[in-house]
């Protein structure tokens, strides 16, 4: 996505 979130949308 907008930012990297561990285990979620990049």
From Swiss-Prot:
Transmembrane residue ranges: none
GO BP: any one term: proteolysis
Enzyme's top EC category: hydrolase
Reactions it catalyzes: Release of an N-terminal amino acid, Xaa-|-Yaa- from a peptide, amide or arylamide. Xaa is preferably Ala, but may be most amino acids including Pro (slow action). When a terminal hydrophobic residue is followed by a prolyl residue, the two may be released as an intact Xaa-Pro dipeptide
Keyword vocabulary terms for this entry: Aminopeptidase, Hydrolase, Metalloprotease, Protease, Zinc
Enzyme Commission number, as recorded: 3.4.11.2
Domain of life: Eukaryota
MF (Gene Ontology): alanyl aminopeptidase activity; metallopeptidase activity
Cofactor: Zn(2+)
Cofactor: binding comment: Binds 1 zinc ion per subunit.
Activity control summary: Inhibited by the zinc-chelators 2,2-dipyridyl and 1,10-phenanthroline.
Protein task: Acts as a receptor for B.thuringiensis Cry1Ac delta-endotoxin.
Family, similarity comment: Belongs to the peptidase M1 family.
The protein's name: Aminopeptidase N
Organism: Helicoverpa armigera
Organism taxonomic ancestry: Eukaryota, Metazoa, Ecdysozoa, Arthropoda, Hexapoda
């Amino acid at each position: 996505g907008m930012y990297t979130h561990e285990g979620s949308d990049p």
